[in-house]
């Protein structure tokens, strides 16, 4: 049996302000820092250690991972970072308040943009400074691969090959792996691992900063999965994610 640990980054400053974040590089909030600390302590209490870690190219995921590894006394392990684990790109919605956007376009429309499988929001124009082609961290990525907007299907398309080619190989090689990423890149991975339908993934809410453990068989099929920590706290965190994008 293999174990894999997935962690969504702790609350970011834009999570706190209920803004669409996507590929915008924002820092953890004070609450997010504490969530990462708690995740590290939980993993330590449960006896977890890791051989290799994976993360995105965005600070909030990197910082969450660094805090966790520091709490475990494992800051020395190899960390592989890739844009393929970035959050879903929210196009022109990035930086907009989710509730205000719901008031303008309707909750139903915002829910479709946020949680449908194959409907992306409006594209971000390539001339804008906030487009990823203008960001030096992506200068080695072919421009044609950098999104102007994404739906979850697009995110799955970039995440799963990386899982197959990189992460899964380390798991099958006997390495203890942790992945610190984002709500939608992790939803993409969970959809694949659990073979979720498009309808079921729409209902999936991954809370910030709470370790999600997968136990996998020899073919990397899930035996079971579970969050670490207090069940009532986990439920509350999931409900908080689900409520985003609703009118206040």
Curated annotation (Swiss-Prot):
SMART domains: PGAM. The active site is at 9 (tele-phosphohistidine intermediate), 87 (proton donor/acceptor). Substrate binds at residues 8-15, 21-22, 60, 87-90, 98, 114-115, 183-184. It catalyses: (2R)-2-phosphoglycerate = (2R)-3-phosphoglycerate. Gene3D superfamilies: Phosphoglycerate mutase-like. Disulfide bonds: none annotated. HAMAP family: PGAM_GpmA. This is 2,3-bisphosphoglycerate-dependent phosphoglycerate mutase. It comes from Borrelia garinii subsp. bavariensis (strain ATCC BAA-2496 / DSM 23469 / PBi) (Borreliella bavariensis).
